[in-house]
């Protein structure tokens, strides 16, 4: 009988290494292929081994106290839900279950007073581990079995073969087939060029011959078509990338050599930066070294600034006392005021007060879970199972912050008196005998009683308590006597500058305004000034409209002409002169820089500044106030109304305005070569072509900008309305389905109504037929019964005769 091989058992180091290498090659989805490398393990066991032990993300360190508290708390909230508890703690489900049982067994041992140092979950001799996938690997024996050696050699060979023979053979066959096809094609072309036609032998194939026919071809209708879009430029073939080494790809030896070189550089950099760890890594000791855990200390109870303040106070008093001693002042007042506050020598060693005793939360939670597990049925009655105080306030347990008692934060320069252990008693009292007290530090003394506290009083003395009561009653009586006499007539008088005081709050000198607030206020003031200055500028500057780069002063008429100018012409000349002055001022102070131009292009503006300055010196620019500009604007509006009424002008429609604008705009032509405008009838054909090309370029730029803007808006609207659109499509589909169902239901209803009508008319006929059949059957049965009776009688008669 052949031996039956059962897969499973303890994992060995060799199997772990093979499994890790196989996962690196095949991934985490092909467990059957991975298990084929391990003769003693199944695919399910390989997957469990990876996800329970070999995965680098698994935490294998010792359980901290916080993790144990969280484990017991979550086990209480979600019992037996280890797959849910595991990601919250950061461990695997098997680790959580194993440590949970370990804590319960440990608690049971403590309850039974069995003090053993062994792990309660440790397997006894002869037991089989039910979960070998969650345990460390067993070391490999020196002399392996033949099966293990064969498995190891096979796995090494399969994992080392990154480029399999089958893939190489397929690629080679494909390349040969392609070369054969190209050779045959070249041969047919050469024969056809020589005038020899060879009919290609076609093999009868079921289906479509994709080399000779075009599948699903639809020939276009006869006629003429525009083929301008079909012209394209063929790509230049880069024959340098068609070499054999580029087609085969990178060799494995080159890749390994590059990786080794990279590892050497990494090790060299590590030696330069961290020499000890590099030495440990090269010597192989890094696997056994363990870094020390971070020292966790409680938060400090007093800051460095407070310590410096205490030191400064002590140094100041010490300097004053030494000065008084050097000057020879030894009277009682000085000695009382300048008392020595140094800590006296104490032969007893100082000890830090112990922290308050805390309860073992882990032990309490484990005892609670053990008690709940072993509880009897509630049908028996009686008292509930006694449990420790538990916490159900959240998913994770509340942590108790352990703090070292701080003796420095107590009130300085005082001496408590009511039985504080290990402290110097207050003067004038007899210290109480204290037994079994831990001596603490010698406190700071307060001979002047500057810092009295409740702890200073000796409440055990009855006379002291009575004296304090008398003093408090006397103080209260004096306070009540000092109250003013009550008055019932009140008059409310507001101060004269109450509104100003409410509007202008007093600024505290001690308050330091934040620098960000100061900068924001200054920036707001600058912005307001900039807006105010912008409002005082011309409309063309405010709207950033294009402005001429050169001023044409030839539009002015000479004054000494014959015949002399009329008043209207003189007014027009004044307007032109003011316009030229404004242009010079704007070109000097607010030169126009198109947004498309780059820095350094407008060089001509700097050269013309001297001309603008010279002109403004002869014809100074006059600034007007806001009120004057408002009056002038109102006067212009009134004059426009008068002219409109006098000339009988109505409201101009948008169509008429556009027509006039197009006519005026068509008479002006922009010359990009000269960067200026001119009349269209004065421009040459070349200038017209350049102007139209420039306009086409500008329009294309606008079109591109608007297309990008539209695409961005479309994308944004798609994001905003995509859900609504999909929802609307779904609802429309549901509505159509419901409508189809309604139509189908109506059709079925009418069908069944017709069927009912036919059935109602056919039922009486069928009933008559059935009744006739029944009657006919009854008559036939009667006849047969009568015949049967006659035959029976005849049989009896014959039997009686014979």
Swiss-Prot record:
UniProt region (Interaction with PPP1R8), positions on chain: 260-606
Pfam entry (one): Myb_Cef
Name recorded for this polypeptide: Cell division cycle 5-like protein
Modifications after synthesis and translation: Phosphorylated on serine and threonine residues. Phosphorylation on Thr-411 and Thr-438 is required for CDC5L-mediated mRNA splicing. Has no effect on subcellular location nor on homodimerization. Phosphorylated in vitro by CDK2. Phosphorylation enhances interaction with PPP1R8.
Disulfide bonds: none
Main location (coarse class): nucleus
Organism, as annotated: Mus musculus
InterPro entries attached to this UniProt entry: CDC5L/Cef1 (IPR047242), Cdc5p/Cef1_C (IPR021786), Homeodomain-like_sf (IPR009057), Myb_dom (IPR017930), SANT/Myb (IPR001005), SANT_CDC5L_II (IPR047240)
